[in-house]
């Protein structure tokens, strides 16, 4: 004969404790999410200016001060763009470099970006190259026309020069290679364009605006003294102690995400 099955009722106290743990866990998770969202909102709106000195040959007397702005993605966060323009105006720069992704494919209004461009071009000669997000935007041509009206020099796989304190400085610009390929104009690799620009033959220092940093070796092989890039966002995924975990077009554990990098006589500054 089998033993009788005994079923004891669950303690009401045990059920309440489990329910309380679930509630506390949900509250903690919600708090973490709120704090994370708040930090991201604050981080996207804060303005941090990083000054970096780069040694190159044949620079103008007193050096060459460049304001480098990249990957704003139409960041009209309150007065952020106004503060950015005011900060650059105070810096007594020789030129301004806009290295792409001023807008993205979601941008619906160019007003704040074009106001910024007009302000900057009144401060110093201002140059712009297309990033990948402008290539995907339906407002690309409107943006280019607006930048020209604002006094910005647009460099689409071309170079120009200007004199700064008696020294001729060549400023060249490569638009994002994806834009060029979609337009059916140039190959995906920048080497062919750089061959045509012949920066190594320039009489003075050369500054190359190029949205994507992963082509550093090609930029260096073609005589660029200073390269200004963006695109990598400091690593779109970063981990404490490890640093950048992932960046677009570089993949996992990317090497070129921010700061100054050197190859031969070429210095690249990534924003």
Residue spans for each PLM region:
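N-terminal membrane-anchoring alpha-helices
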Residues: 1-58
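Short, flexible loop segments at the rims of nucleotide/cofactor-binding pockets, characterized by
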Residues: 44, 72-77, 103-107, 182-186, ...
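Extended recognition/assembly regions associated with phosphoester-bond processing machinery
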Residues: 45, 50-56, 196-209, 213, ...
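Beta-strand-turn-beta hairpins that frame and shape the catalytic cleft
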Residues: 53-67, 152-153, 159-173, 203-205, ...
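Membrane-embedded segments
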Residues: 62-158
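Short, Asp-centered acidic motifs that coordinate Mg2+ and/or phosphate
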Residues: 94-95, 127, 152-153, 169, ...
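Binuclear metal-dependent hydrolase catalytic cores centered on His/Asp/Glu-rich metal-binding motifs
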Residues: 145-152, 164-209, 216-217
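Conserved beta-sheet core of the metallophosphoesterase superfamily
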Residues: 212-271
């Amino acid at each position: 004969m089998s033993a009788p099955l005994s079923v004891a009722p669950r303690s009401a106290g045990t059920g309440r404790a489990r329910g309380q743990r679930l509630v506390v866990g949900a509250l903690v998770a919600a708090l973490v999410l709120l704090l994370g969202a708040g930090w991201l909102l604050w981080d996207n709106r804060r303005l941090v200016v990083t000054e970096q000195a780069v040694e190159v040959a044949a620079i103008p007397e007193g050096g060459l001060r460049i304001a480098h702005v990249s990957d704003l993605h139409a960041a009209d966060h309150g007065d952020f763009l106004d503060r950015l323009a005011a900060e650059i105006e105070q810096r007594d720069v020789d030129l301004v470099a806009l290295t792409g992704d001023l807008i993205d494919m979601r941008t619906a209004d160019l007003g704040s970006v074009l106001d910024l461009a007009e302000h900057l071009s009144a401060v110093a000669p201002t140059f712009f190259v297309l990033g990948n997000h402008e290539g995907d935007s339906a407002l690309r041509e409107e943006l280019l026309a607006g930048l020209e009206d604002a006094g910005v020099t647009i460099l689409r796989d071309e170079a120009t020069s200007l004199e700064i304190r008696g020294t001729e400085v060549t400023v060249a610009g490569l638009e994002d290679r994806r834009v060029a390929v979609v337009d059916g104009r140039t190959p995906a690799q920048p080497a062919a364009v750089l061959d045509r620009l012949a920066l190594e033959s320039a009489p003075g220092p050369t500054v190359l605006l190029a949205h994507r940093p992963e082509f550093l070796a090609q930029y260096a092989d073609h005589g660029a003294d200073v390269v200004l890039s963006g695109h990598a966002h400091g690593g779109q995924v970063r981990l404490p102690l490890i640093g950048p975990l992932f960046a677009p077009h570089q993949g996992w554990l990317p090497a070129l995400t921010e700061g100054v990098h050197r190859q031969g006589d070429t210095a690249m500054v990534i924003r």
